[in-house]
């Protein structure tokens, strides 16, 4: 744009005060507006204006940034630039501000400030509305020489730039098309100059003065380019370039000056990264992608956001274990010993691991199986996965999936997103550093689902042996072979696992422990671990097996051993206090009035009884005397028993029966209570029951009504119509727990039969099974867990469906010896087994025979 402004600016202009940058006529600048005065100017003048005149501002440079807008107007620079506001962009982050794109029109001089608030307005005099050259011959000759000299330097500078031929030609045409008097302002704004130098050019109202001040700036720029070209011939370093014009490139390094250490280190890292790519054993497709990305990285300025993203991507690619693996230990005998030492029981699980080792001995390229351990909490599913990795000699990595509801956690984020990263599978491989680790996918049944996708669906490819050799993470965007990874998933139940995902896994049930197994686990693993954690030794505390049994039966009721472990920890803490007190109070123990051995009353007596620990609260034990924990000590440490054998008490009247239920926490016993009263034949069900269990109750009452005469069942008035003038209420205790499922059918029928017959159900019997309207008993699941629950509760007889007889083989031998299992195919057999003396059938009346 020419210095000779084609626009007549208003005589009164609003002033935009800037403290960074200098706008010259003919140049364009972006500036941020965040002070109160400037914000008022933008909102009142630019955003509400409707004419061209309203978009013209007076830009005053070098204005001090005020500490507060409430202060008086700071001193203003005498010369400013009239500017045209081309664009206004607003934002509220991190605070309200506007970004203006303004173009300089001409110089002006402030004659008088007419208003200071809400934004300053001044009377101005437009400058540099001059003729192109003055009329006097001498001045015209001087300006002509200066103009030619300036133009020559400008052309020389353009031709020395490291640019393509078309770009240089375009700049030449631009120089030729602009008026000579406009060139000083325009070139000053685009070459490397300081704000102080630009301010001097702005103050130079005379055209001759501007030429004289600008020519040295061009010469300085040209000399710098010459020096750079001379250095390049010797060093052949194409990475360090000097670009003079700001919109294109900048001088990043001046030859002869000290090199930027960070830049040199970064260049060294890129060289090392390129070397790692060349020497890596990644597949051909991944290698091509890395070569392409490293070429892009070399051409990027370090200030670009994509530079860091690309570098992180390449570093991940070279760190992944594409072909690095560990050698499996295939000694089956050693593996069996290791598994037995780490875990007690779990024979089915150990058998499957040994089978895998045996097949690996016969076939080296066997694909890793996809195992899923299903069982209640606390039975050791996660620790077994760690033991499997230890047995195989592989690296172990656990991935917690509980609550994960974003498929990107599995597949990763695409690199187009800010903060993108690989998924947990690829990140886990990077962590372990080998391509054949043992991955434990913990709590796979607790995966969520959200708007970000379904992570269970993303696992389909990971857990499919036919597909995971070509697994593609969104972040990598190249295939990675997962076929050598041994995936082990854990779950409490298979009900919440999608069928497609469940079909890809080999399910191995991990049932709860029996009381005998818990005692062995406690004395083999839990007690030594707690002693070590609390700094105790076996010489300081002794927990006999009978005490462990009391903890299991009276203070815990679970399928696993977590609560047992916590109770043992509480005992160790209490003993640690006694031991610590004894170490600090040994002098007290040597008092003459204390007889020998009187301070250790915790030892068991000959008849098996002992004095409680609380007897010695006033007298601490010496550290060498062991403390024996018995039931009385348990009451002092753990409080009164939480569970009692109350089965016989709760079955002391008709209308109560015991059922067996399965939960994700293991098997449980379940009481069913029934009561009848005068009414209109309604059936009331309480206890948070699901639809299936409600239907089982209706089936049971319908079967009993149809067989009332057969068993001589009557209501209170003696009628065989059991619901005639009678209401029935069925209740399932523990009302806060949701209950559902068909396996309570036989229990409900037995409970109602007890109610209407007035007979007591045996107090040592529990039952499970689904019923039909015709009285058949159908098979149910979870027989082993239910049997263990009956065994824990001290029951002696368990009634199961006849078609579940095959499941008895999974029950431990000691449990089968303690329990009497009765199989039933119909409700008649169930009732006969549930009542003492059987449930007799009334004889049918004789039938009339006719013979012709």
Swiss-Prot record:
Lon proteolytic domain segment(s): 651-837
- Primary place of residence? other
Single Gene Ontology BP annotation:
regulation of fatty acid beta-oxidation
What reaction does this catalyse? Hydrolysis of proteins in presence of ATP
> Carries keyword Mitochondrion?
no
Q: Which keywords appear in this protein's UniProt record, sorted alphabetically?
A: Acetylation, ATP-binding, Hydrolase, Nucleotide-binding, Peroxisome, Protease, Serine protease
Q: Cite the PROSITE patterns for this sequence.
A: LON_N, LON_PROTEOLYTIC, LON_SER
Q: Which family does it belong to?
A: Belongs to the peptidase S16 family.
Protein name, per record? Lon protease homolog 2, peroxisomal
**Which organism encodes this protein?**
Bos taurus
Lineage of the species this protein comes from: Eukaryota, Metazoa, Chordata, Craniata, Vertebrata
- Gene name as annotated: LONP2
């Amino acid at each position: 744009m020419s210095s000779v402004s084609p626009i007549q600016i208003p005589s009164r202009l609003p002033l935009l005060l800037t403290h960074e940058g200098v706008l010259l006529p003919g140049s364009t600048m972006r500036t941020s507006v965040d002070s109160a005065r400037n914000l008022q100017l933008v909102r009142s003048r630019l955003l509400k204006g409707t004419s061209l005149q309203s978009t013209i501002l007076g830009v005053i440079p070098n204005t001090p940034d005020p500490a507060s807008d409430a202060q008086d107007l700071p001193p203003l620079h005498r010369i400013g630039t009239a500017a045209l506001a081309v664009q206004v962009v607003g934002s509220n982050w991190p605070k309200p501000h506007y970004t203006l794109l303004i173009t300089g029109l001409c110089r002006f001089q402030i004659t008088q400030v007419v208003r200071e608030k809400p934004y300053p307005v001044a009377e101005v005099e437009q400058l540099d509305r001059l003729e192109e050259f003055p009329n006097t011959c001498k001045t015209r000759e001087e300006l002509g020489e200066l103009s030619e000299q300036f133009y020559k330097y400008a052309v020389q500078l353009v031709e020395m730039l490291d640019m393509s031929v078309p770009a240089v030609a375009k700049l030449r045409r631009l120089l030729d098309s602009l008026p000579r008097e406009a060139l000083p302002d325009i070139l000053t704004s685009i070459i490397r100059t300081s704000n102080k130098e630009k301010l001097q050019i702005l103050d130079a109202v005379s055209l001759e003065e501007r030429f004289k001040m600008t020519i040295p700036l061009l010469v300085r720029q040209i000399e710098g380019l010459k020096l750079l070209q001379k250095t390049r011939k010797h060093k052949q370093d194409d990475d360090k370039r000097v670009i003079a014009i700001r919109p294109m490139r900048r001088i990043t390094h001046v030859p002869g000056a000290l090199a930027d250490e960070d830049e040199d280190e970064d260049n060294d890292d890129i060289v090392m990264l390129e070397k790692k790519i060349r020497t890596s054993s990644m597949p051909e497709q991944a290698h091509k992608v890395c070569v392409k990305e490293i070429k892009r990285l070399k051409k990027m300025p370090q200030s670009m956001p994509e530079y860091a993203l690309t570098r992180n991507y390449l570093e991940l690619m070279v760190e992944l274990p594409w072909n690095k693996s560990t050698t499996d230990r295939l000694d089956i005998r050693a593996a069996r010993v290791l598994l037995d030492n780490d875990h007690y029981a779990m024979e089915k699980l150990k058998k499957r691991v040994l089978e895998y080792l045996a097949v690996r001995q016969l076939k080296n390229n066997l694909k890793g199986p996809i195992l899923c351990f299903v069982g209640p909490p606390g039975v050791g599913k996660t620790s077994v996965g760690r033991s499997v990795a230890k047995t195989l000699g592989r690296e172990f990595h656990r991935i917690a999936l509980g609550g994960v509801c974003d498929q990107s956690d599995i597949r990763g984020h695409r690199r187009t997103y800010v903060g993108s990263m690989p998924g947990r599978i690829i990140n886990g491989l990077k962590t372990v550093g080998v391509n054949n680790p043992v991955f434990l996918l913990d709590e796979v049944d607790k995966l969520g689902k959200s708007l970000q996708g379904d992570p269970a669906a993303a696992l389909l490819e990971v857990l499919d042996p036919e597909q995971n050799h070509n697994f593609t993470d969104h972040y990598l965007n190249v295939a990675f072979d997962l076929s050598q990874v041994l995936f082990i998933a854990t779950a409490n139940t298979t009900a919440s696992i999608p069928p497609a995902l469940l079909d890809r896994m080999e399910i191995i049930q991990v049932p709860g422990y029996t009381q005998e197994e818990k005692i062995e686990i406690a004395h083999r693993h839990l007690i030594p671990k707690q002693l070590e954690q609390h700094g105790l030794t076996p010489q300081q505390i002794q927990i006999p097996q009978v005490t462990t049994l009391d903890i299991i039966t009276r203070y815990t009721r679970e399928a696993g051993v977590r609560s047992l472990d916590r109770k043992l920890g509480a005992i160790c803490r209490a003993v640690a206090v006694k031991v610590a007190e004894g170490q600090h109070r040994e002098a007290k123990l040597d008092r003459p009035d204390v007889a020998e051995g009187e301070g250790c009353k915790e030892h068991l007596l000959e008849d098996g009884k002992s004095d409680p620990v609380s007897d010695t609260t006033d007298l601490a034990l010496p550290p060498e005397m062991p403390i024996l924990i018995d039931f009385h000590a348990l009451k002092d440490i753990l409080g009164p028993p939480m569970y009692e054998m109350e089965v016989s008490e709760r079955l002391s009247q008709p209308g109560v029966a015991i059922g067996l239920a399965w939960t994700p926490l293991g098997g449980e016993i379940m009481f069913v209570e029934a009561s009848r009263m005068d009414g209109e034949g309604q059936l009331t069900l309480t206890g948070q029951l699901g639809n299936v269990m409600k239907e089982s109750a209706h089936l049971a009452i319908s079967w009993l009504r149809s067989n009332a005469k057969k068993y001589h069942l009557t209501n209170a008035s003696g009628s065989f119509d059991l619901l005639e003038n009678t209401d029935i209420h069925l209740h399932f205790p523990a009302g806060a727990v949701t209950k559902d499922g068909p396996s309570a059918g036989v229990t409900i029928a037995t409970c109602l039969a007890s109610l209407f017959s007035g007979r007591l159900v045996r107090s040592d019997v529990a039952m499970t099974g689904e019923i039909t309207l015709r009285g058949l008993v159908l098979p149910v699941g979870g027989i082993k867990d239910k049997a263990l629950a009956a065994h824990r509760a001290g029951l002696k007889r368990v009634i199961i469906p006849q078609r579940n007889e095959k499941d008895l083989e999974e029950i431990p031998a000691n449990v089968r010896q303690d329990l009497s299992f009765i199989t039933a195919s119909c409700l008649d057999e169930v009732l006969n087994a549930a009542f003492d003396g059987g449930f007799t059938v009334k004889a049918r009346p004789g039938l009339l025979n006719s013979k012709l």
